[in-house]
């Protein structure tokens, strides 16, 4: 009953908050993140404290296509979509175990679509959208429980004895209207739908899929969620109460979508791509990639082909915009650190460098630890390499 009442309250709340205007009282407490024109900066001045992790290669730990990385209790958990398995490594890269339960049996999955870590209970939450089930493992890879669902899930987090499901797929993904029209769904411990909140403001999207719209802080159990194309980033506390945390304020030459434009955005694969069209017209778009670090937040406005990064300093409230494609400095370093961010921890970022990029850049990098590391691991039998680093906030 409390979830139903909670849902009704927030349906009313967000129905009256469709205009993402800073004057709206619901947004008055949100922090303003200025979108400025990209600054001119060298990659050598931005990246600092570089460290490297080589993943041990054995007959059981040779990785193919790394899709996700999570860190819990000094262990690295890596989803390899090609191998359809979760690989567990120590923090320094020693192989521990592979989770591989492929099959048609009651305790077997067809394909892992995504996974999250449950820091509070030290568990792994694997989702299989094909069989519509959740597979829960302990931190060492032992299967604890299989939970059947009535819908396909991708990003699903353990929460208050149940789960939160985040709308991350194309339109008409769910059979229930209450799930289709709202971004976040509350599930009980058995995987049953209980309530929804945060209205979906992109009702016409078709083939658009987002994968990085949440960031979980294990210290306070809070989640940051950035709806597709939205100008507001929301905070969800450990009791599932939701608040506007950041609102973007445009001070750049880019254009942002109005609520009306966002509701009318359509993407039909092979037929119509309004995302690419809008970007070519000077719009700054986002799938909603947000990273919550100790001292600042990083918002990645991914658009279609030309990503921009917005860094927000929590202590000063100052934000800067960086276009990674127009960075100055060493070209090889620019290309290396333009790779996708897979995980954050404290003030550190983790990038996974595919072998083709290692082969291309190993001999071109400036002399030093990073170049030596890539050269020593540039073999056909190496695993993809992990780079851990910090970013020095631009002055």
Residue ranges and their predicted role:
Residues 21-56:
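Blade/loop signatures of beta-propeller domains
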Residues 50-84, 288:
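Beta-strand-rich domains and repeat architectures in extracellular enzymes and scaffolds
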Residues 56-61, 65, 94-121, 128:
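Blade-loop segments of beta-propeller domains
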Residues 59, 100-107, 148-155, 200-204, ...:
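Short coil/turn segments at the loop-to-beta-strand junctions that recur within blades
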Residues 65-68, 110-115, 151-159, 206-214, ...:
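Repeated scaffold domains used in trafficking and secretory/extracellular systems
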Residues 75-80, 122-128, 161-175, 215-234, ...:
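Short beta-strand elements that form the blades of beta-propeller/WD-repeat-like
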Residues 129-181, 196-203:
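Asp-box/WD-like beta-propeller blade repeats and closely related beta-sheet repeat scaffolds
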Residues 203, 245-261, 316-346:
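Conserved blade-ending motifs and adjacent loop-strand segments that build the rim/top face
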